[in-house]
Amino acid sequence: MEALVYTFLLVGTLGIIFFAIFFREPPRIIK
């Protein structure tokens, strides 16, 4: 049960960091 919570927190923090970096600078990789 604790492992699930830890993995959820890890994925959440990584997702927040990824979206912060993605929205901070314009997506040049897609174009």
From Swiss-Prot:
Its main location: plastid. One of its GO terms (biological process) is photosynthesis. It is found in: Plastid, Chloroplast thylakoid membrane. One of its GO terms (cellular component) is photosystem II reaction center. Pfam families: PsbT. InterPro entries: PSII_PsbT, PSII_PsbT_sf. Keywords: Chloroplast, Membrane, Photosynthesis, Photosystem II, Plastid, Thylakoid, Transmembrane, Transmembrane helix. PSII is composed of 1 copy each of membrane proteins PsbA, PsbB, PsbC, PsbD, PsbE, PsbF, PsbH, PsbI, PsbJ, PsbK, PsbL, PsbM, PsbT, PsbY, PsbZ, Psb30/Ycf12, at least 3 peripheral proteins of the oxygen-evolving complex and a large number of cofactors. It forms dimeric complexes. PANTHER family: PHOTOSYSTEM II REACTION CENTER PROTEIN T (PTHR36411:SF2), PTHR36411. Belongs to the PsbT family. Found at the monomer-monomer interface of the photosystem II (PS II) dimer, plays a role in assembly and dimerization of PSII. PSII is a light-driven water plastoquinone oxidoreductase, using light energy to abstract electrons from H(2)O, generating a proton gradient subsequently used for ATP formation. This is Photosystem II reaction center protein T. It comes from Mesostigma viride.
